[in-house]
Amino acid sequence: MALPFVLLMALVVLNCKSICSLGCDLPQTHSLSNRRTLMIMAQMGRISPFSCLKDRHDFGFPQEEFDGNQFQKAQAISVLHEMIQQTFNLFSTKDSSATWDETLLDKFYTELYQQLNDLEACMMQEVGVEDTPLMNVDSILTVRKYFQRITLYLTEKKYSPCAWEVVRAEIMRSFSLSANLQERLRRKE
């Protein structure tokens, strides 16, 4: 009986250590995961983007949400979290599963899930550290509307392979732009 308890306690301590070691030094660890996500997304491409030029679309990426120097760290983390959560939701649909290689999609889910966990741990640490509210509601809504436009586009295009290719390229672009926000956060620390 004592051995399972000791093992359980060891797991709890190790898990707590990994979360606490973030010390909310998230941008450095998160940017590595972001790069892995981008590499997986690049591998997911099945058709030439050039064959889909006629399907290009401006989804109105909320650049101002990722450019703003006015962001407090907690606000920036909540915006990054929302973007990753929406990406996870978008690629978790039945229509998405039918489009992408299953092995790559599983790796993609794993990376997104890890990023969400890291961001959630960091968000919890930031509560009370800053006087600003944890969730900047306007920024979160802007990110959600962006993903609604992407979903509407996919629906209008009947989830065609070219539509998914355009969306994949757009999400890669958004992850690249979010890296700029992460870099600014790292410099602020």
Swiss-Prot record:
Coiled coil: none annotated. SUPFAM superfamilies: 4-helical cytokines. Its main location: secreted. GO terms for molecular function: cytokine activity; cytokine receptor binding; type I interferon receptor binding. Disulfide bonds join C24-C122, C52-C162. Transmembrane segments: none annotated. It is found in: Secreted. One of its GO terms (cellular component) is extracellular region. One of its GO terms (biological process) is humoral immune response. Keywords: Antiviral defense, Cytokine, Disulfide bond, Secreted, Signal. Pfam families: Interferon. The keyword Secreted applies. InterPro entries: 4_helix_cytokine-like_core, Interferon_alpha/beta/delta. Belongs to the alpha/beta interferon family. This is Interferon alpha-5. The gene is IFNA5.
